[in-house]
UniProtKB/Swiss-Prot annotation:
NCBIfam families: PRK04290.1-3. SMART domains: Ribosomal_S6e. This is Small ribosomal subunit protein eS6. It comes from Methanosarcina mazei (strain ATCC BAA-159 / DSM 3647 / Goe1 / Go1 / JCM 11833 / OCM 88) (Methanosarcina frisia). Belongs to the eukaryotic ribosomal protein eS6 family.
């Protein structure tokens, strides 16, 4: 079964939250691509919409948004994700993953694009008693 560490970034709060998902929730992500918008309830964020922005596999190879399919490929690259040239015009052949999520992906990066009624901290159980609004 697939297990993923999902890093969900919240642009409003400028914070990131790491969530471990397993089995049925993880299987819902398999086959999705970078740029797809998924329901946040997969990650325990009911009411939220989340966009997949990237990830990497167990060997540390990054997912490239313009590389089709789920497999690893050695591609000739000049700039972009996973490579910064040392000299202008320098190119290099690098191993990268395609944009589709497969079972051997370890980390999935995502960002919130549509917010729900509750805060992310409250949904994940990270809100402490003094941070929570008093219910009177």
């Amino acid at each position: 079964m697939a297990n993923f560490k999902v890093v969900v970034s919240d642009p409003k709060e400028a914070r990131a939250y790491q969530i471990d998902i397993k089995d049925a929730e993880a299987n819902a992500l398999i086959g999705k691509s970078i740029g797809d918008v998924v329901d946040g309830s997969i990650f325990g964020l009911a009411g939220y919409k989340v966009q997949i922005t990237g990830g990497c596999d167990g060997s540390g190879f990054v997912m490239k948004p313009d590389l089709p399919g789920p497999r690893r490929q050695r591609i000739l690259t000049a700039t972009g994700v996973g490579y910064v040239p040392k000299l202008p015009g320098q190119r290099r052949r690098k191993m990268m993953r395609g944009k589709e999520i497969a079972p051997d992906i370890v980390q999935v990066n995502a960002k919130v694009v549509e917010y729900g009624s509750k805060s992310i901290k409250a949904l994940l159980g990270l809100e402490t008693a003094e941070e929570a609004p008093a219910a009177e």
